[in-house]
Amino acid sequence: MTSPLAGMIAEHADIEKRLADPDIHNDPARARELTRRYAELATPVDLAQRLERVEGDLETAREFAEQDPSFRDEVVALEASQADLAARLRAYLVPVDPDDSRDAILEVKAGAGGEESALFAGDLLRMYLRYAERRGWRTQILDANPSDLGGYRDVSVAVKSRGTAAPGQGVFGRLRFEGGVHRVQRVPVTESAGRIHTSAAGVLVLPEAADVDIEVDPNDLRIDVFRSSGPGGQSVNTTDSAVRITHLPTGVVVSCQNEKSQLQNKESAMRILRARLLAAAREKAETAAAAARASQVRTVDRSEKVRTYNFPENRISDHRIGYKAHNLEAVLDGDLDAVIEALTEADLESRMAATP
């Protein structure tokens, strides 16, 4: 048994004992974290136990097959089962991002292309909301800056799973590869001559930070309030309900005006701020994380793209893995599993190849 696997089995047993202690529920946050980790370890521990049983059965079947050829078919079947279980278990032994099982904050920002880009940002928002609905996730618009024609200049959404997610199946684990610049090729509604235009929107996916992940000193914050504005900049509220929070040590600025209550806007802004500060702290500490985040959107430019949505050809193309499919309408309606699975599989294969 490999050392990492032995460690997983020991950790699983230890957590099981700790969760059986009634005192653990005096600390709900810690209990939730242990429950999440216990669920993460359940599958690899089960695979290891099944593999151990199959290997024992295989050894016995081989001994019998030496005396009785009728056992050879059983040997072949057990060898296939052994190979399958070993391959599935190995995937769990590859180092994974601990954030994969977290919830996420997703931001969509219009870029090059003016109003058409804002409309495309709205299409992307709807795509992710529909995908979340298909997955049974909960969503909450934290902040939105609508455009004149019903699109969005920028919008932030909290996406939360229901219950404990399996490894890699959490909101962030599923959406992490959506980060980057998305490009659209189509005839805009504002185009009278019927010419195809290219526009872009940027997507940023952040693991949502819990209070225990990062402490924010209130003295490090400057909080400004102002009146909410709608399309065209007109005021839509007679009270100062919108909130802008500036984290003075880093210069990170977050504003929220989507809710009618100043308190709700402040809470939403703090959620986004914590997520951004957590991501920034991990970037600084981990070179690998910095490289991964560098592939996400910095400036929304048409030249740096991860995916193209081509309306005339009904085609979606993910340029990172050469993925192509002619089901654009379905994808924009939230049918994202195929491309996400392809990206996840490519990432797993890359990490497995790099694992000794």
Curated annotation (Swiss-Prot):
The keyword Lipid biosynthesis does not apply. The keyword Protein biosynthesis applies. Keywords: Cytoplasm, Methylation, Protein biosynthesis. Gene3D superfamilies: 3.30.160.20, 3.30.70.1660, 6.10.140.1950. One of its GO terms (molecular function) is translation release factor activity, codon specific. SMART domains: PCRF (SM00937). The modification N5-methylglutamine is found at residue 234. Peptide chain release factor 1 directs the termination of translation in response to the peptide chain termination codons UAG and UAA. Belongs to the prokaryotic/mitochondrial release factor family. This is Peptide chain release factor 1. It comes from Parafrankia sp. (strain EAN1pec).
